[in-house]
Amino acid sequence: MSTTGKGGKAKGKTASSKQVSRSARAGLQFPVGRISRFLKHGRYSERVGTGAPVYLAAVLEYLAAEVLELAGNAAKDNKKTRIVPRHILLAIRNDEELNKLMANTTIADGGVLPNINPMLLPSKSKKTESRGQASQDL
């Protein structure tokens, strides 16, 4: 005889057998179920495997953590405690791989990287040195 009741669940199970999300099983913070739903309803393919949303969630979580870490460092360098779009832009553009990944991306309110062509900078010539010596000769 089986111990199953009306609902099909075993009677011996306790309340500790709660559902565990796929994000928790994978050890992720990003929602695997939501990403799975987006993949299915987005009509990217007729069928979506069970591992695809887990892998995509892991990749997105890694990229977000990487950008946030670099943006936090940029905020610290500017003596700020809050990350603003400017810090995110500086983080992405100063990292070679992230810059290549997001080359054609515009970040709203990010501004531009500070860059002055060395040719436009005033050159340090001997004229400034001779002025100092001339004043001492008098």
Swiss-Prot record:
Q: How is it modified after translation?
A: Monoubiquitination of Lys-124 gives a specific tag for epigenetic transcriptional repression. Phosphorylated to form H2AX134ph (gamma-H2AX) in response to DNA double-strand breaks (DSBs) generated by exogenous genotoxic agents in both the mitotic MIC and the amitotic MAC. Gamma-H2AX is also found when programmed DNA rearrangements occur, namely homologous recombination in the MIC during prophase of meiosis, and chromosome fragmentation and DNA elimination in developing MACs. Gamma-H2AX is important to recover from exogenous DNA damage and to repair breaks associated with normal micronuclear meiosis and mitosis and macronuclear amitotic division.
Q: Which residues are in coiled coils?
A: none
Q: Name one GO molecular function term.
A: structural constituent of chromatin
Where is the PTM N-acetylserine found along the chain?
A: S2
Q: Does the keyword Nucleus apply?
A: yes
**Where this protein primarily resides, as one coarse class?**
nucleus
Q: Where in the sequence is Phosphoserine found?
A: S123, S125, S130, S135
* Compartments where found: Nucleus; Chromosome
- The answer, when asked if Acetylation is one of the entry's keywords, is yes
Query: Organism's domain of life?
Result: Eukaryota
Q: Which GO terms describe its cellular component?
A: nucleosome; nucleus
Q: Name one Pfam family in it.
A: Histone
Recorded hits in InterPro entries, A to Z, give: Histone-fold, Histone_H2A, Histone_H2A/H2B/H3, Histone_H2A_C, Histone_H2A_CS
Keywords of the record, alphabetical order, are: Acetylation, Chromosome, DNA-binding, Isopeptide bond, Nucleosome core, Nucleus, Phosphoprotein, Ubl conjugation
Cite the location of the cross-link Glycyl lysine isopeptide (Lys-Gly) (interchain with G-Cter in ubiquitin) from the record: K124
Subunit structure and binding partners: The nucleosome is a histone octamer containing two molecules each of H2A, H2B, H3 and H4 assembled in one H3-H4 heterotetramer and two H2A-H2B heterodimers. The octamer wraps approximately 147 bp of DNA.
Q: What does this protein do?
A: Core component of nucleosome which plays a central role in DNA double strand break (DSB) repair. Nucleosomes wrap and compact DNA into chromatin, limiting DNA accessibility to the cellular machineries which require DNA as a template. Histones thereby play a central role in transcription regulation, DNA repair, DNA replication and chromosomal stability. DNA accessibility is regulated via a complex set of post-translational modifications of histones, also called histone code, and nucleosome remodeling.
PANTHER family tied to this protein = HISTONE H2A
Q: Which family does it belong to?
A: Belongs to the histone H2A family.
Q: What is known of its domains?
A: The [ST]-Q motif constitutes a recognition sequence for kinases from the PI3/PI4-kinase family.
Which protein, by its recorded name, is this?
A: Histone H2AX
